[in-house]
């Protein structure tokens, strides 16, 4: 059995303002500023978690740590196959897979920019306490469906 989440104990204040920091791991060849700029765009998307009342604020010392990490780091840190990303359920640590960030996931049927949006929203969903869900075939895939692994009869979707 594979575990796709780390378990955390952090709980957000009722204000629903989430302060986060962002890093690109030293073994990942990707410009940090570009990563940060894209994160800010994806987290502020009106169809993302902001539609549920969350506001995301970049703060270099923020309690939520978002990292662009190599597949090897994710495998070691999260105990997962190197083709996935991971986050703590209700926690503070979110690891985005650098290979997926650069190339996407064919099984998701999403273009790269949309896949990145999905990836950020899905993993942030875990930070916010949401677990994986199933889908209703023919309907848009819920953001918490593991679209990286396939759509299970749903249509591709990036909306929360």
Predicted segment positions?
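A metal-dependent hydrolase signature that marks the N-terminal structural subdomain at the beginning
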Residues: 3-77
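Active-site-proximal beta-strand/loop segments in catalytic clefts of secreted hydrolases
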Residues: 23-26, 67-71, 97-99, 130, ...
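Structured segments of extracytoplasmic/periplasmic soluble domains
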Residues: 41-50, 127, 131, 147-150
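Active-site scaffold of zinc-dependent metalloenzymes
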Residues: 81-112, 138-151, 155
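Short alpha-helix carrying the canonical HExxH Zn2+-binding catalytic motif
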Residues: 111-125
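Catalytic Zn2+-binding segment of zinc metalloproteases
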Residues: 123-139
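Amphipathic heptad-repeat alpha-helical coiled-coil/stalk segments that mediate oligomerization
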Residues: 158-159
